[in-house]
Structures are given as structure tokens and as C-alpha cells.
């Protein structure tokens, strides 16, 4: 991806396994990661009874191979790790449509994270994002979730 900077901020586009890009923003000595649509999108199909091969995704109207898609996602994390292994703040999708926490858990297993902020969960309800808190607590990672649109935090 490309990058842009001035004397106050540096913004770099990094990969995604979906349309668009993810972002690394550096400012005031902090490194912020915005995942965009980067996630383990088909994690919900990786259940105990999954036998491999293609699975039909009714949401997207296509056949997908969840194992192959997970490898693509993990490959993107590997590429980002070539740039850095830590972030002050991470904004990452945690959504019931995609298996809730698997992608975010894989992210915090790969990187040092100062604060995790879930996103993309409004369609599945604000409470769905709280499923991630037990995993951030286990790693002593601060967790902040909005309770309504317009909420903000100073960190």
C-alpha cells in the first residue's frame, strides 16, 4: 500500500482480504491500526463438523473455502507484522455475521495491543462486541466499546 505523511502524522495503507485496505496511522508517538474490512470473514464455518472444501455463504451468495480464506487473512497479518509488531490502539471488526471474535483473537495473538476498540458490530447489536472482552482481559489488553453512536474516548 501507499503512504502519506507530514510533520504531524504518517498514514500507511496496508492489506486486506476484503475490498479496500487497512490503515496504520502514526501520530504523537502512537501507532493506531484501523482494520477496515480486514477479518477472518468465514470463521463461522470453521466449526467442529466442518469437513473441508467449499461451503455456501448465503450472505454473499457464493461458495467459499473457509480454510483457504483463513489462510489469506493470516497472510495479511503476517505482512502487517513485517511493518510492526505493536499498536497503541487497534480498531477491529467484531461482528456476529463473521463468527464474532475469531479474527480479532487471531490479531491480538499476533500483535502487542495497547487498547482494543471493536467495530462493525451495530448490525448484530452493541452487546455482541462485548464477547471480545473476555479475550482482551485474559491478555491484559484494555477494551473500550461504545454504548451508543457518538461516544468517544480520550486515550
PLM region spans:
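Core dinuclear metal-dependent hydrolase active-site scaffold
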Residues: 1-85, 148-155
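Binuclear metal-ion centers of metallo-dependent hydrolases, dominated by the metallo-beta-lactamase
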Residues: 1-5, 101-155
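Small-side-chain structural scaffolding
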Residues: 13-16, 20-22, 90, 104, ...
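Short beta->alpha connector loops
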Residues: 15-19, 95-99, 122-123
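Generic alpha-helical hydrophobic packing signal
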Residues: 27, 90, 142-144
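Structural motif
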Residues: 36, 93-96
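A short, acidic, amphipathic alpha-helical segment used as a generic capping/interface helix at domain edges
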Residues: 75-80, 97-106
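Conserved acidic residues
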Residues: 88-91, 114
